[in-house]
Amino acid sequence: IWSVLWQGRMAKYRNIWETYRNKDKPVVVIEVGGIKRNETWKIGINGVNREADFHNDSVGGERWGKFNVELRPWKQTGHDIIVCGQHTNSHQWRNNPPMSKWFDQQITEIRKYTDKPIIIRPHPRNHVLIDTAKYKNVKIVGPKRDRNTYDDTDLAERLKSAWAVVSHSSNPAMTAVFSGIPVYVSEASLSYDVGNKTFENINQPNMPDRQKWTNKLSYTEWWTDEIEQGLPWKRIKKRLEEKYL
């Protein structure tokens, strides 16, 4: 199926997902890429992001260079903590509170440890309002769409002032790690292996080695010509036969 965002053209896939998953049958999910957005596609079993099985547990670094992504050194500058929202209609958001409440929870927890500026950045297609006046040094700054692209935003520009990025499981965390910015994410995020798990260290975030992470990440996404050649399907089919069928 295409995506687990139960909205618009993708809404019809929810019935397929629930029918097969309720029978413990595997579902292959195709989702827009995060490494090369609008160029590549994630293809995994039984979900998206870290909830999916990409058959990439034991891979080398031979594929990463193909993406031509600069992995910048971890930086210890910046001042803003950027809290990124995501689409609440997505299966990824199940069991989570309304987005406004989630934002409040993140702000409250962060403020236990630091008074750094906090920027709330809602998902571009899932607007939300919260009362920032009850907090100190917190503001909402929505993403600006790049009209020259399908759905790119000004994330790269926003990250220039970032000290850290907070995200449940969406792609901005991945972009932040590429840019050398520490992230705070949930276990559902593809950035979890190089992310921070608690705000207790927000003033001195962990900055782990990223080589193994990029190796695994490179086997989550594929170009259309590779899909036409059957390269990802060959890997996924093998995994299905070994583990799910």
Feature names for model-found ranges:
Residues 107-149:
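Catalytic donor nucleotide-activated moiety binding site of glycosyltransferases and closely related
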Residues 1-3, 24-28, 41-47, 81, ...:
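Active-site regions of enzymes building and remodeling cell-envelope glycoconjugates
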Residues 41-78, 193-245:
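Leloir-type glycosyltransferase catalytic cores
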Residues 150-197:
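A donor-sugar binding/catalytic signature common to diverse glycosyltransferases
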Residues 10-15, 97-109:
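Well-ordered, non-membrane alpha-helical segments in soluble/globular domains
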